[in-house]
Amino acid sequence: MSTFYQKPFLKLLDFTASELTALLQLAAKLKADKKNGKEEQKLVGKNIALIFEKDSTRTRCSFEVAAYDQGARVTYLGSSGSQIGHKESIKDTARVLGRMFDGIQYRGYGQEIVETLAEYSGVPVWNGLTDEYHPTQLLADLLTMQEHLPGKAFNEMTLVYAGDARNNMGNSMLEAAALTGLDLRLVAPKACWPQAALVAECSAMAKKNGGAITLTEDIASGVKGADFIYTDVWVSMGEPKEKWAERIALLRDYQVNSQMMALTGNPQVKFLHCLPAFHDDETTLGKKMAEEYGLHGGMEVTDEVFESAASIVFDEAENRMHTIKAVMVATLSK
């Protein structure tokens, strides 16, 4: 696709609304072609570097399977398998990898790292997650929403994000709403709201596209009429333990449970989560949370909601691969 050819994919606001629509259409086509055994390989002979300073199941598998489906080869560089930022500057790493690879995925820390890779590598660079943004996740979310509300435009959909909205997911949701005109409600304590400047910028764009962005602490009004309720983990492995109690106390009331789902007044409301989710006591961290804070049966979402018919999280997870494939095909093939 000439519009995207050789361009980086760093954050959603680097693109127009029509470009975002084109990517979603390509993802839907690639998904259908794969399922119908009609996929055409566009990336034969391409070499792709996958830099992971932060581990991930979905992102790594999505990039690898998408690349293999399209005939490309991948090299995985984990946190212990590269010198990036330690013995070699990001700028130098970018220039080395750019001579060997046709595209580079980065999942890690600051947004400035992925931007430096894009500036100096000379090849398309894709943001698999940074501290500030998670654009590939939002592509998967938008495709999933389209699939579950066929025939509805985004500016006719209401998406609620409940929990900690000051993270990369909150930022990328704001950008998605700006481009698509979603009715986006960030339902969170004020301490967990995103930066005001980004909210203002995205709100103005969303309004022009027929949507609205609302920030509220009030759960009942915030979720009323929602088509989708979304949440993410409250604590991550590796965060200082002293932050856990503070975060849980702040967010406990914003757990997605059957009561919150009922408050929407929409019997067809769906549940989204970027995963992994602490919805039971079957993980190391989930067990710790249950034992230390009494969060049995789920932290940010209850097991009841996660395992219910309303949950479309595994459709969403599958769509990571199809949308990531669309990004690679769009940026690496003419």
Swiss-Prot record:
Biological or metabolic pathway of the protein: Amino-acid biosynthesis; L-arginine biosynthesis; L-arginine from L-ornithine and carbamoyl phosphate: step 1/3
Catalytic activity: carbamoyl phosphate + L-ornithine = L-citrulline + phosphate + H(+)
Binding, carbamoyl phosphate: S56, T57, R58, T59, Q83, R107, H134, P135, T136, Q137, C274, L275, R320
Gene Ontology cellular-component terms listed: cytoplasm
Major location (coarse): cytoplasm
Domain of life: Bacteria
GO biological process: arginine biosynthetic process via ornithine; citrulline biosynthetic process; L-arginine biosynthetic process
Enzyme class (EC, first level): transferase
Keywords: Amino-acid biosynthesis, Arginine biosynthesis, Cytoplasm, Transferase
EC number: 2.1.3.3
Residues engaged in binding L-ornithine: N168, D232, S236, M237
Pfam families: OTCace, OTCace_N
Assembly: Homotrimer.
Name of protein: Ornithine carbamoyltransferase
Source organism phylogeny: Bacteria, Pseudomonadati, Pseudomonadota, Gammaproteobacteria, Enterobacterales
Gene: argI
